[in-house]
Amino acid sequence: MIATPKIIRAVADLVGTPAYLYNQKVIEEDVYDARAFERVFGEERFTLRYAMKANSLEALLRLFNNLGLHIDSSDGNEVWRAERADIELSHVLLTCQILPPQEELADYITRGMNPNAGHLDHLEQIAAAGGKDITVRINFGEGSGGTPKTTTGGYGSSFGMWHTEIPEILERSRALGLRVVRLHSHIGSGSDPQVWKRNVRIMLEHADAFPDVHTLNLGGGFKRSRWHDEKTMDMEECARDAYEVFEAYQERSGRRLRIEIEPGTYLIARGGILIGRVHHFRHKHDPDNGIDYNHTITDIGMTENARVCMYGARHHLTLVPEDDGREMTSTFVVGPACESGDALTVRKNDPNRLRRERMRTPTRGDLIVQHDTGAYCDSMAPHDYNSHGEAPAVLLKPDGELVVITYRGTREQLVQHEVKYSPTPSLAL
């Protein structure tokens, strides 16, 4: 638990429920862990980027910037948000499927942003926008993620140029006056450490083809445990393994390459929780099969954390307080949306199969906490569904102060992009 019951109640009193709470101290601890690469490679040879798609809130971007991290962005709008948080564009790498419009791309490049070409057509677009020194994302055939939906390498992935296209990448780049200075590869989120290590070796095998490359960006996807049968990736072990192969490459080639990584989940997942409230507890008994069905209905669900219904992700749930003498029970826990898939308790990687959560018997008004929701929850929230609106966010500072960093979305904000227009029926019904 990253916050005491007293703090959780204070957040609920401050902004209501549902609400996100982020613990600054925990986030800083996880940044320190990721800097194992810096301690192994040396500060001058390593860059830690934050994959801002994991959570793009301005206060959190500012925290990572103040901690000295650079940014991995996945859309032109993310570049805009990073700059809005006073992050220098020279610290931003843009890796996306579809590049921004040429005028916008040219403006970003002129002011120092680093463009990453993930498709052959990107090379022409970047050159037309005035790009010179570029990154290229290459799919070297290795893919590994916590689920098929989070695997971003291998034959089944659309991300990055395929490794057999390297000769064409080089030919086009030279013809366009582009200099490839960084190689990038990202194999997936929640990846297997052994596959990640193998991909590092494959990247170095191909580095000889790019004489101007000075940096290898090894991507992100470092596993952060959210469940008792999951294992957090050992960053120091990965760093030491990478260092050995980088040193061997230097001895063979004479090139001393820099290294970058761009974690998102690893840096912020553990540092966030979602605070909700129990509204109903229902019990049903199936006499034909002798099975009890308990359902706990809360005000947190898919509109605050879509990972559960998208991936079959598992997040621990606890009531506050955890133990007040009430009997234990097994219950399905669901959200408030008018959607059967809005469940908080599902089987591993299978959102279509529910599981029961063991907890003390909930009662109306209890606070409930969903853990490890710092990453890919707020940023992926389909809050327009059922017109629920956005949940607010609070930051717990190391000195114990609670700071509201986003307000609850209003009804007016739900419709602010809509045009008042009343179509005339075309059929007489």
Sequence positions of predicted segments:
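Acidic/histidine-enriched ion/cofactor-binding microenvironments in catalytic or ligand-binding pockets
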Residues: 129, 205, 211-213, 237-240, ...
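Structured core elements
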Residues: 70, 93, 116, 135-137, ...
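Charged (often Lys/Glu-rich) extended helix/loop segments that serve as interaction or gating elements
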Residues: 32, 254-429
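Short acidic, glycine/serine/threonine-rich loops at helix termini
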Residues: 61, 84, 104-107, 126-130, ...
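A charged N-terminal "starter" segment
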Residues: 1-132, 136, 156, 167, ...
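General structural feature for long, well-ordered alpha-helical segments within catalytic domains
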Residues: 7, 23-26, 30-33, 56, ...
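Active-site loop/helix belt of alpha/beta enzymes
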Residues: 140-286, 386-388
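Active-site beta-loop-alpha junctions enriched in small/polar residues
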Residues: 25-26, 51-57, 76-77, 97-99, ...
